[in-house]
């Protein structure tokens, strides 16, 4: 391989990683950090690195199919990407996350560094012990090898994927089908808005009372100077009266504070309910358009596929099978078997594999980022101080999620591409186990989501008009 090929390969890899890292930083700052002020530079860099190396795994799968770059360059890129990503996930992120938690709690820098190092040792021990309960490669070459680390990361990542996929398999038809859309009366929304305004006005009035009560306490405390000029008896009586007044005022302030907190919580709930009703009203109006009807048909098709996927996963769990062929591939296979259309089947299967993997990549990345945003905004409501911790946690989950996606996507590839990924990840990895594990968690998550969404839908049906 000449120097020109080396420079070209390095340029393509470097440019793609820089582009992916920039995309990760854009997503973090524009979509996640939009309403939050705390922005640590190192946290952003770590998130961008994990995002770049994670997405590069999918890019490398496409490079193998197209193909792009030489075989040797792709092989080196695989190893470099996995090495850097595992280094970040297993060593850097746990250590730095613990260090930041300690520093934010007021621990001195030297002690935080030491405690974070001890935590990393405990984390590595727990990470190693986790592999005892799952099929793992032979430990002859040691713990810190690519197959050992990828296998353990895969268990966590596949579990996260299965939970998200199980919920999505139930929630997606529920979101798309007009059957589950309820009609919202505008007067219900107006009633809620009046209640929200009344709650906010009452809250403001009580806050004013708190301010006035505090001013009254300051006035009473300021009257001590005047009491010193009076007789001894008058000072005693004044002190007793002032003490009683202060106690009563303090009790009033505490009572008002509790009422204000309750009103603020009520206002928040009313605001969220108004928002949900507005969204439901928009969805109901959209369902009556031609695009809404098309989405409804798509919802029925997706419902059939999701039911099929749940049944096949249940079959895989019950009969301990290693996963089955998806209906799209099955249909194409049957068609080509019965109809000779004069097309090279090998070439066609390669292009179909490319399209299918591309769709899997786009859907997987899009679905993961959507869930990242939901999780981020849900957790970050507790305060801006937790934003950094949430971003680091999401970086950890993101890397594990994408590595696990490669473990599962591998089975959808043609044998020639499957062998390459097997060699890179390690031939000792029990790939079939991850498919069975995914199916088991997927079925449990899907049925639990079905119960929760059914309960939610039933409660909405029994309460057509939530406002009396």
From Swiss-Prot:
UniProt KW Phosphoprotein keyword: no
Residue spans crossing the bilayer: 7-27, 45-65, 82-102, 112-132, 153-173, 297-319, 345-365, 389-409, 437-457
Q: What is its main location?
A: membrane
Pfam families xref list: ABA_GPCR, GPHR_N
Q: Which UniProt keywords apply?
A: Cell membrane, Coiled coil, Endoplasmic reticulum, Lipoprotein, Membrane, Myristate, Stress response, Transmembrane, Transmembrane helix
Q: Which GO terms describe its molecular function?
A: abscisic acid binding; GTPase binding
Per the record, what phenotype accompanies loss of this gene's function? No visible phenotype under normal growth conditions, but mutant plants are sensitive to cold.
Coiled-coil regions listed in the entry:
243-279
Question: Which protein are we looking at?
Answer: GPCR-type G protein COLD1
């Amino acid at each position: 391989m000449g120097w020109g090929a080396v420079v070209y390969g390095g340029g393509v890899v470097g440019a793609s990683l820089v582009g992916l890292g920039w995309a990760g930083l854009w997503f973090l700052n524009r979509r996640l950090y939009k309403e939050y002020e705390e922005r640590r530079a190192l946290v952003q860099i770590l998130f961008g690195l994990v995002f770049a190396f994670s997405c590069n795994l999918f890019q490398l799968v496409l490079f193998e199919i197209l193909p792009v770059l030489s075989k040797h360059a792709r092989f080196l890129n695989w190893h470099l990407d996995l090495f850097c990503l595992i280094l970040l996930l297993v060593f850097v992120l746990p250590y730095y996350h613990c260090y930041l938690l300690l520093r934010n709690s007021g621990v001195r820098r030297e002690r935080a560094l030491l405690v974070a190092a001890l935590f990393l040792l405990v984390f590595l021990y727990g990470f190693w012990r986790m592999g005892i309960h799952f099929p793992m490669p032979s430990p002859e070459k040691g713990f810190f090898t690519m197959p050992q680390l990828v296998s353990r990361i895969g268990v966590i990542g596949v579990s996260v994927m299965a939970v998200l996929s199980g919920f999505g398999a139930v929630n997606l038809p529920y979101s798309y089908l007009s059957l589950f859309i309820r009609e919202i009366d505008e007067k219900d929304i107006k009633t809620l808005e009046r209640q929200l305004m009344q709650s906010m006005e009452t809250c403001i009035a009580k806050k004013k009372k708190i301010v006035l009560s505090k001013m009254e306490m300051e006035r009473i405390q300021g009257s001590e100077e005047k009491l010193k000029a009076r007789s001894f008896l008058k000072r005693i009586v004044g002190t007793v009266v002032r003490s009683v007044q202060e106690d009563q005022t303090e009790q009033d302030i505490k009572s008002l504070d509790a009422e204000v907190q309750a009103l603020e919580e009520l206002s928040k709930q009313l605001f969220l309910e108004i928002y949900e009703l507005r969204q439901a009203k928009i969805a109901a109006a959209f369902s009556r358009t031609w695009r809404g009807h098309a989405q409804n048909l798509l919802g029925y098709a997706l419902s059939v596929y999701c039911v099929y996927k749940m049944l096949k996963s249940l079959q895989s769990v019950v009969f301990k099978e290693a996963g089955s062929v998806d209906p799209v591939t099955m249909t194409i296979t049957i068609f080509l078997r019965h109809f000779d259309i004069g097309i090279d089947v090998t070439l066609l299967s390669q292009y179909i594999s490319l399209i299918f993997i591309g769709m899997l990549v786009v859907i997987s990345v899009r679905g993961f980022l959507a869930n990242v945003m939901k999780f981020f905004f849900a957790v970050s409501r507790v305060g801006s101080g937790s934003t950094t911790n949430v971003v680091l946690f999401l970086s950890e989950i993101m890397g594990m999620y994408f590595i696990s996606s490669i473990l599962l996507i591998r089975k959808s590839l043609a044998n020639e591409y499957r062998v390459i990924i097997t060699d890179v990840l390690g031939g000792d990895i029990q790939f079939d186990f991850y498919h069975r594990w995914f199916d088991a968690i997927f079925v449990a998550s899907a049925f639990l989501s079905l119960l929760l969404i059914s309960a939610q839908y039933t409660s909405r049906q029994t309460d057509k008009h939530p406002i009396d």
